[in-house]
Amino acid sequence: MSIVDQLHDQTLKMAAEITANPQSDTLVEDFDAFLIERDELMRDIQHELTDQEKEKIKEIIQTDQQMAKQLTVIQNGIKADIQAIQKKKTKQLNYQNPYQPMTSDGVYYDKRK
């Protein structure tokens, strides 16, 4: 199996995993390992590519773009979850101690004696 074939198979496998389990806890770790393996395989490509290998590389690029879109959606979902948790946390703190976050806006100092 050529390096391009291995790269193609790994890319399709990772794309299928992202599509099948977008909320997986191990997705980030798996994707990181995939990127490391892909980088090593890409460094090993040193020969002239055949037409068939060029077509596979075009398919890899298209799949990579689709994975990037899916990962952006997942990232935005995670950001929204983090923001919701932070809002919930601040509301809970304000409820527990409503006089803590006193601001100094509108403070009037009387200079009369």
Swiss-Prot record:
Stretches of the chain forming a coiled coil according to its record: none
Source organism, top-level taxon: Bacteria
A GO cellular component annotation in the UniProt record: cytosol
Compartments in which it is found: Cytoplasm, Cytosol
Single GO biological process annotation from the record: bacterial-type flagellum organization
Keywords from the UniProt entry: Bacterial flagellum biogenesis, Chaperone, Cytoplasm
Assembly and interaction partners: Homodimer.
Function text: May act as an export chaperone for the filament capping protein FliD.
Protein family according to the UniProt entry: Belongs to the bacillales FliT family.
Protein name (database record): Flagellar protein FliT
Originating species: Bacillus pumilus (strain SAFR-032)
